[in-house]
């Protein structure tokens, strides 16, 4: 938290691994979304998601968005940064 506050990043990614038989997850997140997250951050999540989807589609890689991993609890690795000025994202990889 101290380093985050000193650096004030514009983008923060929380990377995770899922089961080997899973696909990939990236923003936009599932509902509910914390109502205190600014619209500009939510717009950024959508833009990152569109960019990711375009590349995944281009190469025929399976993925999903908005089905899991909400952005509500303020202590998540994506919501806390989003509540503190960064575009906070969770990525799950197979």
Question: Which residues make up each language-model segment?
Answer:
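Structured catalytic-domain cores with a bias toward divalent-metal coordination
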Residues: 1-94
